Amino acid sequence: MEKVPMTLRGEQMLRTELERLLKLRPQISEAIAEARELGDLKENAEYHAAREEQGICEAQIRDIEYKLSVAQVIDVTKMENTGKVIFGSTVTLIDVDTDEEKTYQIVGDDEADIKAGRISVSSPIARGLIGKMEGDEVAIQTPGGAKDFEIDRVEYI
């Protein structure tokens, strides 16, 4: 089984969601029991809704448990900063053409949130940055075409 990289923050988010779902599980079972008491199950909307909710909840629990079982949690704060872009590092880029500064943290696929500055390790930008060093100039293929960036800072935060 291949390990999937995940930040400490990503692991904590998954564990919090798993805890929430595990607390929800008995409530759904109660709703099913109450709906059963209402009689005929063929035309019992409450029963069918609760069963559907149970199926969704169980699927989410299995999904999170699987993700946690294959996760390789990487805590970059415990690593020596060598200036090299690695999984979990926070990279500040300067657009060579516009001098615009952008900062991204390279995270696992499930943790990515571009609005929060977290990009997936498998995104074109991250793939173009991994292994490069602070001060390097890189050409990255973006949806708008190739762009040149300078790696201004690499932080392990």
From Swiss-Prot:
PROSITE patterns of this UniProt entry? GREAB_1, GREAB_2
The entry's keywords: Coiled coil, DNA-binding, Transcription, Transcription regulation
Q: Which residues form a coiled coil?
A: 17-37
State any single GO MF term: DNA binding
Q: Which HAMAP family match?
A: GreA_GreB
What the protein does?
A: Necessary for efficient RNA polymerase transcription elongation past template-encoded arresting sites. The arresting sites in DNA have the property of trapping a certain fraction of elongating RNA polymerases that pass through, resulting in locked ternary complexes. Cleavage of the nascent transcript by cleavage factors such as GreA or GreB allows the resumption of elongation from the new 3'terminus. GreA releases sequences of 2 to 3 nucleotides.
Tell me its family.
Belongs to the GreA/GreB family.
What is the protein's name according to its record? Transcription elongation factor GreA
Taxonomic path: Bacteria, Pseudomonadati, Pseudomonadota, Gammaproteobacteria, Vibrionales
GN (gene name): greA
